[in-house]
Curated annotation (Swiss-Prot):
Family recorded in the similarity comment: Belongs to the MurCDEF family. MurE subfamily.
Function: Catalyzes the addition of an amino acid to the nucleotide precursor UDP-N-acetylmuramoyl-L-alanyl-D-glutamate (UMAG) in the biosynthesis of bacterial cell-wall peptidoglycan.
One Gene Ontology term, aspect cellular component: cytoplasm
Modification sites for N6-carboxylysine: 240
Coiled coil: none
Descriptive protein name: UDP-N-acetylmuramyl-tripeptide synthetase
PANTHER family with a match to the protein in the record: MUR LIGASE FAMILY MEMBER, UDP-N-ACETYLMURAMOYL-L-ALANYL-D-GLUTAMATE--2,6-DIAMINOPIMELATE LIGASE MURE HOMOLOG, CHLOROPLASTIC
Annotated ATP binding sites: 127-133
Binding site for UDP-N-acetyl-alpha-D-muramoyl-L-alanyl-D-glutamate: 34, 171-172, 198, 208
Pathway annotation: Cell wall biogenesis; peptidoglycan biosynthesis
Organism the protein comes from: Treponema denticola (strain ATCC 35405 / DSM 14222 / CIP 103919 / JCM 8153 / KCTC 15104)
This protein's UniProt keywords: ATP-binding, Cell cycle, Cell division, Cell shape, Cell wall biogenesis/degradation, Cytoplasm, Ligase, Nucleotide-binding, Peptidoglycan synthesis
Post-translational modifications reported in the UniProt record: Carboxylation is probably crucial for Mg(2+) binding and, consequently, for the gamma-phosphate positioning of ATP.
Keyword Ligase belongs to the record: yes
Amino acid sequence: MEYTKSIAECIKAIEVVNCFGNDKSLINSVEYDSRKVRAYSYDDKTGLKKGAAFFALPGIHTDGKKFINSAIENGAVCIFYEGDLNNHSCDEICFVQVNDVRKTMSKVSALLYDEPSRTLGVIGVTGTEGKSSTVSFIFQLLNLCGKKAGFFSTVEYSIDGNVIPNPEHQTTPESNVVQLRLAQMRDSGCSYAVVEASSHGLSPKTARLEDVIFDAGVFMNVTQEHLEFHGTIEQYRYDKANLFRALDKNPGKGFPIFGIVNYEDPSAPYFMEATQKNVYPFSTELKDLKKIEEYKGLFAKDIEESSSGIKFTLCDFSSRKEYGCELKLAGIFNVKNILASVLAVQRITGLDIACIIEKLPLVKPVKGRMMLIDEGQDFEVLIDYAHTPSSFMTIFPSIKERIKKSGGKVISLFGSGGERDVKKRPEQGRIAALYSDIVILADEDPRGEDSVELLEMIAAGCPEKKRGEELFIIPDRPSAIKKAFSLAGKNDAVLLLGKGHENSIIFKDRTMPYDEETTARKLLIGADCTNP
């Protein structure tokens, strides 16, 4: 389906500093990458030229204004920019100067696609960890309960029932993609949209979610992460809470408006106070029981994990009933993700919670999240996206305890993202050393940093590990995984952490296609992994 809006119509909806050139054309797409601008054409009904609006976004490494000529050559009919514009003039093109080009791109994108979030029940999920799994679980439960939904997350997205791997490294895409995907969900008959709302996406610096009308906000947790972007943990938390502040701006669309918080996290009260709407908590800790009862939330008790999955009892303080629950998922932490998901689906649809709970055994794990790889080897291989100290503490203790009981050892392999928060690196090393018998450090996404220097910063956190026996630095990830498998024996566990679902490794001068699952499986069966 093609969407079009006149340039004049778009200009009326935004704050304009200056405008010159031809404003009679039609906009049929919004782009910030000049390479994606396609040749203009002419509208059959009006005869007017129609093409892309190019937004010259300011960036850390470059400025979008450098690509204006390229966008025009490729067929853009309108250029939006901020600041001064040098050596650009073309009578056939409309130039629009604005104060904030990112916010303007969000506004124009929403307008172009007829504000899709106005007709969808939109659930946003934020948190340092657990976002992608919770988004997927909400999406799955909605569809299992007969409520057509779409979603997008770090891992994958769906607009029409088909789940597609996310081609980007961004958790929350730029606003033009956000609005397009929401429009595609609406047009394919979806009633609900589940959105992974990262702190970057919720920050006014990016305005990626600026014009999304949220009906529900789900908060999972806040731990130290992305400080290279937010500056402080306080600002990081503040930006995440923008999801809950957005609930108060909802004009009312016929869906319930509410928040959900993980009451185990110390920041839960902060998020509850960020909105005037009802907020429902969940927890697995006895100390929170009174608060969960007071706010009519969900509580999980009698949690047991085995090789076949997880069992627990769910206490619903809204109906004051208890339900036995079964999950075919690994990782006790997934109980909290499921509590958030059940609560979100029940509150936004009004369905009987028992109908939702009976679908839980059908919920599937997310790619790259506690994924068990079995090629007949006598040791366990788990792939997980864990890449922060807090996520390490979520997965390591229970795995260590379980493997220790069987007499095995834990071998962990991971790295850390280049050009990102450096403070977490030695802490990653410390936690891994505490729970692992062998630590192997390998590339994650070194970007512009030297691989060995980066990995040595992690190694500084585990000085007690003997080099060459208990600690290895092997930048090439396939080679590092091969080493890990060579050291593994019966009843051992090899944890491949940090890449999860991602489809590449980013270096300074190149991006290498890479899939952790494919690489692991090839190495387990003895295949060549030179080009995984």
